Amino acid sequence: RNALRAIGVPDDEYDPERASAFLADMCRVRAEWVNETTRKELERSLELEAAGAEGLKATPEGVFENAIENRSVSAGTAIASAVDGWSAIEAARQVGADAQKRWVTTSRNPRPSHAAMAGVTVGIDEKFPNGMDWPGDWAGGPDEVCGCQCEIELVTRI
């Protein structure tokens, strides 16, 4: 709704039902990423444990502790970024706004690929040069998405 207000469109012109497919796909992809990362970390922890290593990720218990203390925060941030970016773009599309989208890098320590995107503006239906439609777009894969704090700014054409 904030995205609608930003471009001067009444809230009731947005159809929230169209978000259902996006949210289902996003949750499916994110669950796959979480499960794959957890599997890899568990396999590695068993190797480390067998070798007598110590540390947070050196036991299966430590893998889950790390997931709760660290990975969950990073995942939550990335999911919020993805939903925010997608919803702004979808709202503009649904109301037929003549708008562009600008990548806004907000992190104090962004990954280099996201720092390079700062201020890049493209058409609402175009991909950014990194192949993503918005920050948090799973097209970037987990290495580009996890922990992403970037945002989208809608730019209306006058």
Briefly describe each language-model feature range:
Residues 1-147, 153-158:
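Domain-core detector
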